[in-house]
């Protein structure tokens, strides 16, 4: 149980880190016009990933690939959904906090534009393919 709680907490922190990386991406797209903003945003998104790696946080997308090794313990398999829920809580919590801060600003318009364009792209994909790719994180 202690292992699962640690995985849950580290999952929440990983979700917060990825939320931070995503927010840095949006800020760059918002404040630096054109392709340069997207490139800088992509580089700054790595801040979230770097935080996950250096702090040894539990990010589902980083752990799911280990399933195919077949050498994991039962606790590892149990911790996957626990960390996924933690990731979601951390990312949604960070997103909600940012929404509360920036809801009446032009930054939120940029967030809406980016999310809408991404959702439009995914909506043309096959439903089963989207579910499989999102669950296995492209593995």
Where in this protein do the model-derived segments appear?
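Alpha-helical transmembrane segments and their helix-helix packing motifs
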Residues: 1-139
